[in-house]
């Protein structure tokens, strides 16, 4: 007989190496074959629901790490809630309309001019659906579970119909109206442009300083004072209606050779230099805050028009005078601030960039040519203080490479002002993980202007608006609902396939159309209105979901995006927020915190991580991040994540190997009869479980990541599993001491696998499939471990022991360095009380100390002589163990004997081997 044959060594088919890139797809195929998503729902049918509503990613392009971070975080939550017994359906969605898809088709060589609008839209739809299939495959490869066979898609007829109904209800409440707003306009293309169609090039522009006389001082400034503005677009001066100052900036009234000028104090030196003022002749006469200057009235330099002094937070001290020329018809900030003061929107420029009749003496001039005419007139009026030329970065049309302008054109708006307070109240009633999230969306809603919902494109949901012969707008409940019904049946392409009269209810008449002819709106809706309608198109429409959702979770850019548009349309139509709880995550940066870009060569994409390391590594990385802020990823970070994964995997494998001959139904030891050390570990498991459950509840995955490592390293690897080898391998198979440990080991393995399951979805499933006697076919169909009250007194006692054990380990390390011993089993440890700790009394209640310390002999005495080393928990002496080494267990003994041909066996091993002979 060989010694090895008498040992109970670990046995498991669970491989040491993960091989995740190859193994994970096999596990996923099994899940799909078993329809695990619906099985999990069926298991919890009738239970309390939890709805995490998916914000739809855009259906264009490959997934980036931000997509992975987002979907994996959502998967953590939904899987955890499912394992807690909630009915938690997860319906992924896609946003499919908008300019990028139009651009993508153009890049692919699709010539829009050679086909009808309806045909072009059909190609857009085909492209979007192709992109969805690609992204869907990649999301599933990350281990994300959801109803991917029936996702929601914003181009589906039923979704578009729901969106139209929201529009109609808002229109019914007077929240939809038509007005003018400045947009990027390309005179060379004669069309409006989206930001994505803008590129920046250097341009030489006039730089002018202009004086505006005070007309009504409001008792604040001197009546003969002048405001100085600076602009690089002289052609917009005819559209000036205001001067904007920052409410919190300090402004000064400066006397310069008898002239009184008002500018920001922080810019006074720069202005003096630009205008060649003699510094000796400059005198600061008065000081104001921008707030105090509000509502002072200035006079337009050459038109019979007032220019109101107003407040705006967009004013900076980076350049200029701190007094900003404001023309709401030609600037985004100007328009937004102008809305607050109900300023007129003047934009006397036509589609070709030429001044209209409204431009007065500049009529017929191309805007760029008008620059000289305007500066000449300002000089004539004595208002031009300085003309110069600068070269600066300026927006150009990406197609024609020609400069663009801001030009006010008719647009459709959703009124924010009428529902702003209701939205703010809804935000107050919404829960947030962090207060700054609430502050962020609250301030955005509080400060935002009206919502421009129209776009001059073709790939989107048409605005369901008609016009009578006399130009009157037709947007009634009857007409809008009829369009919604048509879209539900045929899709929105019908708008581009039929005449206006065929889109109106049968027999529809209107006093503005005596001849019965109508036209239809050509603009489409902003894509944020599309995705912002998902609470109606998805939550209220799908039977397994419900409104409002329990949770929305997206990137922090969605405070101004989807979070904002969703709560706006929901409050406007339903009076409540569409989400009860809001959570956001940061962006994914490289290892140094820099933005990823191809030019820097620092881009890491999900596909690369999955193919090289596996989805579970990507998921473990997500759990390791403080996702509320921006997170970092690099090859080095992923290597560290892989190292942590390896440690987790090997620990689970060790436990699997050592419960291979254990049946919990027949071999378990009742808790009251467990060895105390096993009861300690059982209570530590309960403590770890309670903490992990609490962290899942609070979405604190970084805590889980850290505590899993701590539990594995400190409690298991450094102590329990190391201590356990002498029992699991050496003791008799059915001995009480071995079964006691296996009882707890099995519990740790099962509970840890469950607790890790939402994060390491594939590995947990693999462990489960190798765990004997588990009841559920999949760990993902099991329930989370229950939180059980711990025996605090026992934990406190053993924590003290573990501190004492640390002292013993330190003493062993010293003895090893001094060549007193080699391995710890060569040691004999003597422990005595000292002034700091009564070790001899404390240790009386502990059995098998030599096993707990992993040494051969332990002696506890009241006192030791001066040769002992004093530690926090007693005086300790390390000597070489007495006797000789047992050839089977490697413990030292003075009573070695033989059984059959096996010699050098300690008494314990003699007894075990005899039972095998």
Curated annotation (Swiss-Prot):
Domain of life: Bacteria
Enzyme class: ligase
Residue window of motif 'KMSKS' region: 595-599
Example GO BP: isoleucyl-tRNA aminoacylation
GO CC terms in record: cytosol
Catalytic activity line of the entry: tRNA(Ile) + L-isoleucine + ATP = L-isoleucyl-tRNA(Ile) + AMP + diphosphate
Protein name: Isoleucine--tRNA ligase
Residues noted as binding Zn(2+) in the record, renumbered to the chain: 886, 889, 906, 909
Gene3D superfamilies according to UniProt: 1.10.730.20, HUPs, Ile-tRNA synthetase CP2 domain-like
Domain notes: IleRS has two distinct active sites: one for aminoacylation and one for editing. The misactivated valine is translocated from the active site to the editing site, which sterically excludes the correctly activated isoleucine. The single editing site contains two valyl binding pockets, one specific for each substrate (Val-AMP or Val-tRNA(Ile)).
Function, in words: Catalyzes the attachment of isoleucine to tRNA(Ile). As IleRS can inadvertently accommodate and process structurally similar amino acids such as valine, to avoid such errors it has two additional distinct tRNA(Ile)-dependent editing activities. One activity is designated as 'pretransfer' editing and involves the hydrolysis of activated Val-AMP. The other activity is designated 'posttransfer' editing and involves deacylation of mischarged Val-tRNA(Ile).
Cofactor note: Binds 1 zinc ion per subunit.
HAMAP family, per database record: Ile_tRNA_synth_type1
Binding-site residues for ATP, renumbered to this chain: 598
UniProt key word Lipid biosynthesis: no
Molecular function in Gene Ontology: aminoacyl-tRNA deacylase activity; ATP binding; isoleucine-tRNA ligase activity; tRNA binding; zinc ion binding
Main location: cytoplasm
Placement of sequence motif 'HIGH' region: 57-67
Binding site for tRNA(Ile): 632, 640
Co-factor(s): Zn(2+)
E.C. number(s) listed in UniProt: 6.1.1.5
Subunit relationships: Monomer.
């Amino acid at each position: 007989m060989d010694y090895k044959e008498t040992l109970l060594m670990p046995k498991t088919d669970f491989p040491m190496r993960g091989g995740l890139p190859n193994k994970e797809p096999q596990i996923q195929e099994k899940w799909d074959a078993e329809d695990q998503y619906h099985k999990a729902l069926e298991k919890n049918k009738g239970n309390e629901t939890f709805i995490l509503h998916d914000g739809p990613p855009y259906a264009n392009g490959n997934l980036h790490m931000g997509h992975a971070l987002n979907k994996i975080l959502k998967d953590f939550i939904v899987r955890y809630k499912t394992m807690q017994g909630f009915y938690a359906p997860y319906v992924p969605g896609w946003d499919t309309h908008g300019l990028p898809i139009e651009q993508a088709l153009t890049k692919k060589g699709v010539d829009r001019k050679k086909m009808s609008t309806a045909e072009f839209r059909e190609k857009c739809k085909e492209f979007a659906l192709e992109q969805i299939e690609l992204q869907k495959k990649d999301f599933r490869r990350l281990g994300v579970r959801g109803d991917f066979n029936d996702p929601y898609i914003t181009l589906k007829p039923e979704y578009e119909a729901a969106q139209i109904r929201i529009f109609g209800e808002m229109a019914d409440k007077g929240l939809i109206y038509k007005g003018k707003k400045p947009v990027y306009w390309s005179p060379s293309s004669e069309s409006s442009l989206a930001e994505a169609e803008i590129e920046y090039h250097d341009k030489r522009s006039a730089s002018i300083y202009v004086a505006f006389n005070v007309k009504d001082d409001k008792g604040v400034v001197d009546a003969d004072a002048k405001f100085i503005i600076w602009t690089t677009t002289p052609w917009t001066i005819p559209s000036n209606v205001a001067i904007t100052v920052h409410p919190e900036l300090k402004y000064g009234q400066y006397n310069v050779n008898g002239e009184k000028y008002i500018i920001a104090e922080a810019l006074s030196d720069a202005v003096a230099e630009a205008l060649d003022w003699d510094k000796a002749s400059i005198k600061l006469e008065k000081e104001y805050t921008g707030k105090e200057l509000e509502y002072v009235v200035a006079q337009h330099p050459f038109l019979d028009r007032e220019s109101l002094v107003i407040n705006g937070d967009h004013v900076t001290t980076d350049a200029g005078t701190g007094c900003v020329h404001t023309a709401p018809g030609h600037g985004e900030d100007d328009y937004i601030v102008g809305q607050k003061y109900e300023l007129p929107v003047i934009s006397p420029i036509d589609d070709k960039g030429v001044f209209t009749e409204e431009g007065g003496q500049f009529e017929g001039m191309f805007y760029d040519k008008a620059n000289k005419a305007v500066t000449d007139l300002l000089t004539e009026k004595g208002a031009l203080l300085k003309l110069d030329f600068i070269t600066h970065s300026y927006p150009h049309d990406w197609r024609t490479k020609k400069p663009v302008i801001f030009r006010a054109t008719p647009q459709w708006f959703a009124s924010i002002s009428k529902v702003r307070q209701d939205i703010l109240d809804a935000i107050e009633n919404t829960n947030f993980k962090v207060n700054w999230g609430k502050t962020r969306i609250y301030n955005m809603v509080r400060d935002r202007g009206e919502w421009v919902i129209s776009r001059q494109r073709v790939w989107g949901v048409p605005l369901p608006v008609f016009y009578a012969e006399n130009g009157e707008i037709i947007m009634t409940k009857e007409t809008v609902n009829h369009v919604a019904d048509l879209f539900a049946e045929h899709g929105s392409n019908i708008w581009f396939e039929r005449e206006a009269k065929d889109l109106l209810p049968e027999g529809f008449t209107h006093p503005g159309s005596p001849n019965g002819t109508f036209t239809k709106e050509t603009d489409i809706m902003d894509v944020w209105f599309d995705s912002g309608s998902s609470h109606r198109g998805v939550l209220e429409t799908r039977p397994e979901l419900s409104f409002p959702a329990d949770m929305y979770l997206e990137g922090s850019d969605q405070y101004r995006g989807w979070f904002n548009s969703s709560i706006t349309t929901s409050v406007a139509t339903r009076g409540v927020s569409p989400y009860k709880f809001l959570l956001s995550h940061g962006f994914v940066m490289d290892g140094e915190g820099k933005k990823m870009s191809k030019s820097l060569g620092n881009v890491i994409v999900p596909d690369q991580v999955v193919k090289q390391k596996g989805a579970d590594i990507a998921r473990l990385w997500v759990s390791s991040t403080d996702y509320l802020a921006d997170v970092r990823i690099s090859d080095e970070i992923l290597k560290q994540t892989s190292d942590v994964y390896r440690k987790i995997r090997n620990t689970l494998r060790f436990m699997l190997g050592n419960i291979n001959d254990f049946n919990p139904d027949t071999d378990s030891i009742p808790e009251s009869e467990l060895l105390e050390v096993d009861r300690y570990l059982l209570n530590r498991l309960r403590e770890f479980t309670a903490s992990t459950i609490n962290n899942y509840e609070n979405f604190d995955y970084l805590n889980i990541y850290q505590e899993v490592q701590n539990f594995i390293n400190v409690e298991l690897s450094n102590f329990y599993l190391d201590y356990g080898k002498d029992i699991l391998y050496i003791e008799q198979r059915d001995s009480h001491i071995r079964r006691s440990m296996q009882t707890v080991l099995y519990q740790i393995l099962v509970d840890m696998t469950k607790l890790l399951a939402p994060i390491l979805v594939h590995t947990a499933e693999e462990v489960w499939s190798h765990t004997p006697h588990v009841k559920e076919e999949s760990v993902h169909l099991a329930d989370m471990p229950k939180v059980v009250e711990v025996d605090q007194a026992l934990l406190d006692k053993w924590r003290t022991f573990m501190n004492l054990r640390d002292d013993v380990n330190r003493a062993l390390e010293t003895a090893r360095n001094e060549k007193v011993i080699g391995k710890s089993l060569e040691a004999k440890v003597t422990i005595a009380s000292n002034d700091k700790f009564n070790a001899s009394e404390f240790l009386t209640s502990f059995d098998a100390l030599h096993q707990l310390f992993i040494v051969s002999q332990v002696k506890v005495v009241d006192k030791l002589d001066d040769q002992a080393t004093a530690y926090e928990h007693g005086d300790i002496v390390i000597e070489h163990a007495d006797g000789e080494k047992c050839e089977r267990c490697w413990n030292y003994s003075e009573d070695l004997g033989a059984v059959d041909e096996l010699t050098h066996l300690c008494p314990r091993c003699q007894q075990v081997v005899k039972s095998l002979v």
